[in-house]
């Protein structure tokens, strides 16, 4: 019985970590207002719910971007797609060495509210996170 309960809790936590697509009408007004205030020249292409947070995907200055908001409209982080060649030295080599047969498909620069910069390298089935110096942090399965 304990095992079943633990499996159910794990399944619930896992389901909360995956993004769920949302209709704009399902996004809190505070979040939509915050988006319009911070990115007045952009139009949301897609809304997603990530756990208790809300992600807006949009294009700005010819680059794919996203911003993650809390339910009150506070920015948690921003993500800007970059060229793979813009990743810090060593990230592409790290992928080749540690994920045999894989290559980086997409790359992004992520900045949190404290100004901390991380890089995301997307490979098949997961995203790999690196610090601003290119040091591996963790992998996130898609």
Give the location of each predicted region.
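Short, non-transmembrane alpha-helical segments in secretory-pathway proteins
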Residues: 22-44, 85-103
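A short beta-turn/loop motif at secondary-structure boundaries
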Residues: 48-50, 110-114
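Bacterial Sec-dependent N-terminal signal peptides
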Residues: 1-22
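Mid-chain, structured segments of secreted extracytoplasmic proteins
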Residues: 61, 65-105
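Acidic (E/D-rich), amphipathic helical modules within compact regulatory domains
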Residues: 36-79
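Short, low-complexity, Pro/Ser/Thr/Gly-rich segments in the mature regions of secreted, periplasmic
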Residues: 127, 131-142
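Conserved histidines in hydrophobic membrane contexts and catalytic metal-binding motifs
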Residues: 56-57, 115-126
């Amino acid at each position: 019985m304990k095992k079943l309960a633990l499996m159910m809790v794990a399944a619930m936590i896992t389901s909360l970590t995956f993004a769920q697509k949302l209709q704009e009408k399902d996004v809190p007004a505070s979040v939509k207002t915050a988006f319009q205030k911070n990115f007045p020249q952009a139009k949301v292409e897609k809304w997603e719910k990530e756990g208790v947070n809300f992600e807006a995907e949009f294009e700005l200055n010819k680059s794919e971007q996203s911003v993650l908001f809390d339910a009150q409209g506070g920015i948690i982080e921003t993500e800007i797609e970059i060229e793979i060649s813009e990743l810090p030295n060593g990230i592409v080599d790290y992928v080749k060495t540690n994920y045999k047969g894989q290559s980086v498909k997409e790359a992004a620069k992520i900045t949190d509210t404290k100004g901390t910069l991380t890089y995301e390298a997307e490979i098949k089935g997961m995203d790999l996170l690196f610090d601003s110096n290119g040091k591996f942090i963790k992998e996130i399965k898609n």
